[in-house]
């Protein structure tokens, strides 16, 4: 059973506080759009699909509360304006991920259409919004499973290495490297890149998953490793600067006998030409994959593809606080590594050093072998060009 990071019933929304993982499992209630803005900005919830869903549902909860308490205007245009203002506010929480802006635009159009219907009141406009936001939650889980199945099939057909063990069906097994966190903690459930790994594991086709630590926020060691252990998927954690050595090795010991066949990552925004903004460090992995002849795949729902952004040069890259690089937070442990004490923050850098901390980098489309979506895997044509418009 996979982790559940978002729990929702009408009028109630809770998120798993990812800042406390893997040491504490705490669900935070969100009652309003403002609550969600802070949760997203503070990265208590993260991952492009997840933040869009949490943002949308937080406003659904707020509208439900207002309607229940008879605090919504009876005028449809007033409610529409309220919703649009709050959606705009939510989009400002993290600017790079396109899913949030895409969801806000889509929900805004639904609200606008409902508000223009003759005889409709304010509560009915709010109801239209709530129903649309709830569908987003259902659709994301369905889409993630489709991404997982499509990606697993493509990997087994295109990225098999000759070395390694066989599954029970005689299919060669694969080892996959992933970066950051793209699983149940980053989506409504199952995951995108991690969903592909889950699908490979479910069919007995996965030899081993490798996950990077993903500095400076350690989403790999804190979150992806947590999910892999939770699901009993055979996995190994590496630091970010070990990836080249891993790809160069033909064998990593008796328990890890398959060379990496594919690197699969998620995305926060994919430009129309296939350039991909994702967690910092993704670009470097793509360069390594090209050198070592390893398939490099991006797994993302179509809502992550921004056809209005022509190339990666047009993507705004969020920069995070210096303290995320110079300090690290975790529980105190004994000298033998046993026991979990109070959470503490320690410094790991020289005082006074300058820090550059971009949250994302952009991987050129030329380094991407395929983009895994819920409707299949998009590959480049003979000229090396993605035609992403064909999947819409």
Swiss-Prot record:
<comment type="function">
    <text>Catalyzes the interconversion of methylthioribose-1-phosphate (MTR-1-P) into methylthioribulose-1-phosphate (MTRu-1-P).</text>
</comment>
<comment type="pathway">
    <text>Amino-acid biosynthesis; L-methionine biosynthesis via salvage pathway; L-methionine from S-methyl-5-thio-alpha-D-ribose 1-phosphate: step 1/6.</text>
</comment>
<keyword id="KW-0028">Amino-acid biosynthesis</keyword>
<feature type="active site" description="Proton donor">
    <location>
        <position position="268"/>
    </location>
</feature>
<dbReference type="InterPro" id="IPR000649">
    <property type="entry name" value="IF-2B-related"/>
</dbReference>
<dbReference type="InterPro" id="IPR027363">
    <property type="entry name" value="M1Pi_N"/>
</dbReference>
<dbReference type="GO" id="GO:0005737">
    <property type="term" value="C:cytoplasm"/>
</dbReference>
<dbReference type="GO" id="GO:0005634">
    <property type="term" value="C:nucleus"/>
</dbReference>
<comment type="similarity">
    <text>Belongs to the eIF-2B alpha/beta/delta subunits family. MtnA subfamily.</text>
</comment>
<dbReference type="InterPro" id="IPR037171">
    <property type="entry name" value="NagB/RpiA_transferase-like"/>
</dbReference>
<keyword id="KW-0539">Nucleus</keyword>
<dbReference type="InterPro" id="IPR005251">
    <property type="entry name" value="IF-M1Pi"/>
</dbReference>
<dbReference type="InterPro" id="IPR042529">
    <property type="entry name" value="IF_2B-like_C"/>
</dbReference>
<feature type="site" description="Transition state stabilizer">
    <location>
        <position position="180"/>
    </location>
</feature>
<keyword id="KW-0413">Isomerase</keyword>
<dbReference type="InterPro" id="IPR011559">
    <property type="entry name" value="Initiation_fac_2B_a/b/d"/>
</dbReference>
<keyword id="KW-0963">Cytoplasm</keyword>
<dbReference type="Pfam" id="PF01008">
    <property type="entry name" value="IF-2B"/>
</dbReference>
<dbReference type="GO" id="GO:0019509">
    <property type="term" value="P:L-methionine salvage from methylthioadenosine"/>
</dbReference>
<dbReference type="GO" id="GO:0046523">
    <property type="term" value="F:S-methyl-5-thioribose-1-phosphate isomerase activity"/>
</dbReference>
<protein>
    <recommendedName>
        <fullName>Methylthioribose-1-phosphate isomerase</fullName>
        <ecNumber>5.3.1.23</ecNumber>
    </recommendedName>
</protein>
<keyword id="KW-0486">Methionine biosynthesis</keyword>
């Amino acid at each position: 059973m996979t982790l559940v990071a978002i729990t929702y019933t009408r009028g109630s929304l809770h998120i798993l506080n990812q800042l406390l993982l893997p040491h504490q499992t705490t669900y935070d209630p969100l009652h309003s759009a403002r609550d969600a803005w802070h949760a997203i900005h503070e990265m208590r919830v993260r991952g492009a699909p997840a933040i869009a869903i949490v943002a949308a549902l937080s406003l659904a909860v707020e509208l439900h509360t207002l309607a229940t308490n008879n605090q919504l205007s009876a005028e449809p245009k007033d409610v529409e304006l309220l919703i649009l203002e709050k959606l705009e506010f939510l989009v400002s929480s993290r600017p790079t991920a396109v899913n949030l802006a895409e969801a806000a635009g889509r929900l805004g159009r639904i609200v606008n259409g409902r508000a223009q219907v003759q005889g409709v009141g304010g509560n009915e406009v709010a109801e239209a919004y709530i129903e649309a936001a709830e569908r987003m939650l259902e659709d994301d889980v369905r889409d993630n499973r489709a991404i997982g199945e499509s990606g697993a099939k493509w990997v087994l057909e295109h990225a098999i290495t000759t070395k390694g063990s066989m599954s029970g069906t005689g299919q060669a097994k694969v080892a996959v490297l992933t970066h950051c966190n793209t699983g149940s903690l980053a989506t409504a459930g199952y995951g995108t890149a991690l969903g592909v790994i889950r699908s490979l594991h479910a069919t007995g086709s996965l030899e081993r998953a490798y996950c990077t630590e993903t500095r400076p926020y350690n989403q790999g060691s804190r979150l992806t490793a947590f999910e892999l252990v939770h699901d009993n998927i055979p996995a190994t954690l590496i630091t970010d600067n070990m990836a080249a050595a891993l790809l160069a090795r033909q064998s990593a010991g008796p328990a890890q006998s398959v060379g990496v066949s594919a690197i699969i990552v998620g995305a926060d925004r994919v430009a129309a030409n296939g350039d991909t903004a994702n967690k910092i460090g993704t670009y470097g992995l793509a360069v390594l994959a090209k050198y070592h002849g390893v398939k490099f795949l991006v797994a993302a729902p179509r809502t992550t593809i921004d056809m209005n952004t022509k190339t990666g040069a047009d993507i705004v890259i969020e920069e995070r606080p210096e303290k995320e690089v110079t300090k690290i937070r975790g529980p105190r442990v004994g000298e033998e590594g046993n026991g979990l004490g109070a959470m503490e923050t320690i410094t790991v850098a020289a005082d006074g050093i300058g820090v550059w901390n971009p949250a994302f980098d952009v991987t050129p489309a030329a380094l991407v072998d395929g983009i895994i979506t819920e409707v299949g895997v998009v590959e480049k044509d003979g000229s090396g060009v993605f035609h992403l418009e064909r999947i819409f």
